[in-house]
Structure formats: structure tokens, C-alpha cells
A protein has these predicted regions:
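Phosphate-binding loop of NTP-binding sites
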Residues: 6-12, 21-164, 170-179, 230, ...
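Beta-strand->loop->alpha-helix junctions that form or flank phosphate-binding loops
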Residues: 41-45, 86-88, 177-198, 217-223, ...
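Short internal beta-strands
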Residues: 162-166, 299-302
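A short, compositionally biased
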Residues: 166, 196-203
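Nucleotide phosphate-binding/pyrophosphate-handling subdomain across enzymes
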Residues: 198-200, 209-312
């Protein structure tokens, strides 16, 4: 309904219209802006413009990018480094998916591969968490999906870095001057050691090529957050956050809405909401629950989110 458009947004000189692929081209309000000559950009195009005017810290991958990018944003935001952040979920620390800074050169962005949106970005540094095929309604084949990630690595700017999950099937193709690191839970340039899980808590030691941070407590004690945390800490470390800032930030991280989100927790019942749609993600979620609650019965309610995604 174009009558819902605020009057101040009908001034072409001062209005930038930003939309996502979820908005149909025939949507009435989008049609109004297009037919009246407004400046219109996809969200991914705007994020691309932002990464060309700041140092983009981007997190891409089939799984884990929302939690990892939100965690990295929290680590930097509460450190002396600071950051701007455009996230794919609502941070429970801040109650928003947008963080601002007047002084930091860094912008944390969740790099979405849907519709090849991440090809608009110019990352300074990027994590790639996983490349299990997804969005096959867009890509068609596994090979095309992997190729899109290879092309994405060519966009990382010289002087920056690629932090690649160890063992991925894809081939990176970075420009000269881009440092390449690996990470995982247990091995790689960045990894965790001395992992302690028990009594609803997780402690780890973080190992980097040039430092080690001992006795880090995970603010959201879920086993998958060990790996997510290693990637987030790697980004924060390479961006200049101190060891103590990283340690404090990991302990104070409160998670993301709908990402292993505890809705009810008492002695009798634990109710979790988790946005896991890919088979690998669902398996990891169940594994994480089982590790935390070894003696409880697990009941799963699965909501198919998209027909094409569930079919593929």
C-alpha cells in the first residue's frame, strides 16, 4: 500500500531505497519508487559500497555465519577497536542487528551467498565457515555453488586476510598480498585446546599463530560455539583486539535470537528455538543438545522454511 510510505520518504533528493531479494519486483511500494525515478539499490549493493569505504570484516558460509559475525561484532564493539556491524540476526547483547561507531575503520558484515549477494562485497578480511551446497534453486549444481565461493575469495583486498575453515572442498583464489589462514575446532592456524565441557559451562584455550589465550569461558555454552568462537576470535585478534578484551568479550556474549535460543529452561523442561534448516545444521544442533543434556529425552519439531530448500 503506497499510502503507508511516509511523506518524508517521497522526496527523491533525500531518499535512498534499499530492498532485499525477499521483496517481489511487483511489490506496490517498490513499484512506486521505481516508476517515480528514485535511487534504488539491493541491500547487497549498499553493503558493497560500505565495504569499499571501510575495512569490511565479512563472514560467509553455509552454516554459522550469523552467530560468528554477531560474536565477532561483539568482541570488537566492546574492545578499544570498535566496529560498525550489519548482522543477519538480532544480537541479544544489543537488541538489534545494527551497531554503529563514529571512529572505527571496521565494518562487520554477514556475507550472504543467496542470489550471489556476497559478490558485491570488497572484504578486507573474511571468514568462510562451510560450503555444504545450499540454495540450489539459485545455483543449480554443487559445482556452481563452490565456484561462487572461489570467486568470492578473489574479492578480498590486498593487505587483508582469508580465514578458511580447515578441510573445505572449495579452492581459494586470493589476490597477491592476501594472507590465508585455516581454523577449526581442533586444528589449523587458529584452533581450540584444553576444551572443558560440564555443568552447563564450556571453557577453552584459544591458540593463534602468535598468541594463546587460556581459560576462555563461552557466554553461550554450546559446543558448536567453540568453532564459531575460534573464527570470531581470529577476526578480532587480526583486527587488533587485545587478548584480555577477547577473553572478556567471549564471556559476555549472549547469543543471537533464534540461534540456539533458550526460550524456557528449568529442572524439568528445556525449550530451544534454533534456525537450522540444512541437514548438516540440524545434525549439529541435535549433537550440541545431546552433549549438554546427556540424560534427557530430545524431541524435535521441524518447520520446513522454504519448499525449494526442503526439496533440495
Amino acid at each position: 500500500d503506497i499510502n503507508l510510505i511516509p511523506e518524508e520518504c517521497k522526496d527523491k533528493a533525500s531518499t535512498l531505497v534499499v530492498y532485499t531479494p525477499a521483496v517481489p519486483q511487483e511489490h506496490a511500494e517498490l513499484t512506486y519508487f521505481r516508476e517515480n525515478g528514485f535511487d534504488i539499490h539491493k541491500r547487497s549493493q549498499v553493503l558493497g559500497i560500505i565495504t569499499r569505504s571501510s575495512k569490511g570484516l565479512c563472514v560467509a558460509g553455509t552454516h554459522g555465519k550469523t552467530t560468528t559475525s554477531t560474536m565477532a561484532a561483539h568482541l570488537l564493539h566492546q574492545s578499544h577497536v570498535g566496529c560498525i556491524a550489519f548482522l543477519g540476526g538480532i544480537s541479544k547483547n544489543y537488541g538489534t542487528n545494527l551497531l554503529l561507531s563514529a571512529t572505527s575503520p571496521y565494518t562487520v558484515i554477514e556475507a550472504d551467498e543467496f542470489d550471489r549477494s556476497f559478490h558485491w562485497l570488497s572484504p578486507w578480511m573474511s571468514v568462510i565457515t562451510a560450503t555444504d551446497p545450499d540454495h540450489l534453486d539459485i545455483y543449480g549444481t554443487k559445482e556452481a555453488y563452490l565456484e561462487s565461493f572461489r570467486h568470492y575469495t578473489t574479492l578480498i583486498q590486498p593487505g587483508g586476510a582469508l580465514i578458511l575453515h580447515k578441510g573445505l572442498e572449495m579452492q581459494a583464489d586470493v589476490q597477491p598480498g592476501v594472507a590465508t589462514y585455516t581454523y577449526s575446532r581442533n586444528e589449523g592456524d587458529f584452533h581450540a585446546e584444553n576444551i572443558r565441557i560440564g555443568n552447563g559451562e564450556i571453557f577453552i584455550d584459544f591458540v593463534a599463530p602468535d598468541t594463546r589465550i587460556n581459560d576462555i569461558q563461552l557466554g553461550v555454552p554450546v559446543s558448536i560455539n567453540i568453532e564459531n568462537g575460534v573464527a570470531a576470535m581470529a577476526l578480532a585478534h587480526l583486527s587488533g583486539a587485545t587478548d584480555e578484551e577477547i577473553k572478556q568479550g567471549m564471556a559476555s556474549f549472549r547469543g543471537v535470537d533464534r540461534r540456539f535460543d533458550f526460550k524456557l529452561k528449568n529442572d524439568r523442561i528445556v525449550f530451544l528455538s534454533d534456525y537450522a534448516h540444512h541437514p548438516a545444521e540440524i545434525a549439529q544442533s541435535v549433537k550440541s543438545v545431546r552433549e549438554l543434556y546427556q540424560d534427557k529425552k530430545i524431541t524435535v519439531i521441524f518447520q520446513p522454511h522454504l519448499y525449494t530448500r526442503t526439496r533440495d
